């Protein structure tokens, strides 16, 4: 990184996740959250972004943000201060590519930088908001490429506004060539169990089913299933699946999905789950409470000797059916 001093922008979950897998010797962190300046997060002192005004020629800024819209918003702030991508700032997804690629190669996958770059560009610059981490969407694309020879449909459970699926479908021909099932209530959470963070109960209600439907109108193999999983799963036509992506955040829905799809997953197929990450103890109060029900459901469902591959950079877990 050109030998300059390194500074982080963003003192939330993105910083905590990346510091576990891609530790970087940051000098300090900036964050515009009111009241955060002067505190310490992950061992780093937090300052106001104003500090960067006079630092442009002396530092390289790394954007630590979980969602592409947040990355884009920070990049806009940096551009207004005269910073330029690749010259004196990058985003942490580029670090994630470097740490995840060798792990995928060790599993027999062939990670591709061109696919990563396309996922990154679509996530940041398309009109469809993607709320999945850039590297997480790319990881899904690489797994779909790996499952090219596996028989079966594709399912994505937990769609929100459709951004992740939109990027995947525009990057990966495997996704376009097979039935691609999108399952969601398209109305936010129904109810939370005792092991889910109660303060997240109102999340994901800002969504319009008709708008999501319009996004995928020109993808002939995309099928949308609207409703709670306990309502839609019994109505699904009996199919085999090569790949299932689960991003429903909560314990009970994840449990229901695992019970339904695992028996219908073809040998060699893959289940990919989001929010399978345990945040470090003592996370700052401003950091949203992590969803922990997904990890609990996975641990309860699988036999104890089942290999689960963890990618804390993006809070994903992978399970292949052997």
Predicted feature residues:
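Hydrophobic, well-ordered beta-alpha structural blocks that scaffold small-molecule cofactor pockets
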Residues: 1-115, 119-126, 130, 140-147
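N-terminal pre-P-loop "Q-motif" helix
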Residues: 135-139
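S-adenosylmethionine/decaboxylated-SAM
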Residues: 104-107, 113-128, 141, 148-322
């Amino acid at each position: 990184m050109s030998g300059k001093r390194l500074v982080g922008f963003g003192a939330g979950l993105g910083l905590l996740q990346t510091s576990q897998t891609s530790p970087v010797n940051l000098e300090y962190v900036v964050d515009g959250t009111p009241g955060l300046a002067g505190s310490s997060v992950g061992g780093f002192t937090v300052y106001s972004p104003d500090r960067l005004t006079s630092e442009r020629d002396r530092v390289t800024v790394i954007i630590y943000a979980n969602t592409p819209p947040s990355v884009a918003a920070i990049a806009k702030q940096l551009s207004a201060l005269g910073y330029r991508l690749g010259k004196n700032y990058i985003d942490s997804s580029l670090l994630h590519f470097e740490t995840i690629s060798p792990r995928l190669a060790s599993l027999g996958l062939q990670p591709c930088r061109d696919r990563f770059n396309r996922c990154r560009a679509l996530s940041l610059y398309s009109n469809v908001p993607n709320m999945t981490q850039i590297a997480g969407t790319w990881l899904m694309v690489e797994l779909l490429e790996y499952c090219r020879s596996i028989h079966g449909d594709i399912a994505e459970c937990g769609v929100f506004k459709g951004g992740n699926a939109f990027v995947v479908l525009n990057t990966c021909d495997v996704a376009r060539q097979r039935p691609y099932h999108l399952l969601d209530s398209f109305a936010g959470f129904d109810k939370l169990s005792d092991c889910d963070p109660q303060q997240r109960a109102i999340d994901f209600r800002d969504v319009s089913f008709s708008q999501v439907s319009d996004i995928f109108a020109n993808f002939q193999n995309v099928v949308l299933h609207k409703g709670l999983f306990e309502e839609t799963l019994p109505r699904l036509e009996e199919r085999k699946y090569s790949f299932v992506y689960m991003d429903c955040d909560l314990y009970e829905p994840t449990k229901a999905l695992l019970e339904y799809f695992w028996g219908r997953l073809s040998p060699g197929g893959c289940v990919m789950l989001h929010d399978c990450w345990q945040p470090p103890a003592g996370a700052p109060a401003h950091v949203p409470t992590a969803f922990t029900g997904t990890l609990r459901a996975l641990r309860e469902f699988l036999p104890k000797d089942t290999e689960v591959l963890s990618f804390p950079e993006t809070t994903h877990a992978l399970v292949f059916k052997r």
